[in-house]
């Protein structure tokens, strides 16, 4: 059991670059390639803390001597999706949707927790897989969108850690 607290987990990101290729004369169908930098925080329930022991095996331990206020895994990723996009102009804005595969490069992971106001880093090595593959997409209108991303490869090295496949759903907007 991963003891995930999904309602408290979150991520934020910024689009670094985008490149689009139209596949038809009316510019309604195309391929879009993006580069996004994303910071992710996966929170855990109760007194559970993600840790790596001296045999380099990652798992959960329960803190029984203190009340853990917050426990989470955080990491950065560079996400590079290649998506097939369809768009349709309505008034002055476009209705658009896209779906396709994505690759992410993950690094700088930390398992941290709080007891009262004191923050502790449990480990900086949770056997994070450095490369991940996803199915992802979005749909939107104008400057607002709803996005989703679902891993098809595990977040952690399954030989040394619990098997988990992250899923993200969120809102995006253009500045």
Predicted feature locations:
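Transmembrane beta-strands of outer-membrane beta-barrel pores
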Residues: 18-20, 35-43, 101-109, 143, ...
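Extracellular/periplasm-exposed beta-strand and loop segments of Gram-negative cell-envelope proteins
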Residues: 1-8, 42-75, 106-136
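Membrane-embedded beta-strand positions of outer-membrane beta-barrel proteins
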Residues: 31-35, 80-82, 97-101, 137-139, ...
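Early exported N-terminus immediately downstream of N-terminal targeting peptides
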Residues: 24-52
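Short loop/turn motifs that connect adjacent beta-strands in outer-membrane beta-barrel proteins
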Residues: 21-30, 89-95
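Predominantly the C-terminal beta-signal and adjacent terminal strand-loop region
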Residues: 123-175
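Residues that define the transmembrane beta-barrel architecture of outer-membrane proteins
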Residues: 6-14, 27-29, 74-80, 129-135, ...
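Detector for outer-membrane/organellar transmembrane beta-barrel domains
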Residues: 69-106
């Amino acid at each position: 059991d991963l003891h995930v607290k999904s309602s408290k987990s979150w991520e934020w990101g910024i689009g670094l670059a985008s490149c689009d290729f139209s596949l038809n004369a009316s510019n309604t169908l195309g391929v879009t390639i993006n580069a996004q930098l994303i910071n992710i925080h996966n929170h855990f329930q109760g007194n559970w803390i993600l840790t790596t022991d001296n045999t380099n095996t990652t798992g959960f331990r329960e803190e029984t001597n203190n009340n853990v206020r917050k426990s989470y895994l955080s990491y950065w990723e560079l996400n590079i999706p290649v998506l097939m996009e369809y768009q349709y102009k309505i008034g002055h804005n476009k209705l658009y949707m896209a779906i396709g595969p994505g690759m992410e490069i993950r690094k700088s992971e930390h398992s941290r927790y709080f007891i009262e106001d004191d923050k502790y880093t449990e480990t900086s090595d949770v056997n994070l897989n450095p490369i991940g593959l996803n199915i992802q997409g979005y749909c939107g209108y104008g400057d607002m969108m709803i996005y989703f991303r679902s891993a098809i490869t595990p977040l952690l090295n399954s030989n040394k850690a619990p098997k988990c496949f992250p899923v993200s759903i969120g809102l995006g907007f253009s500045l």
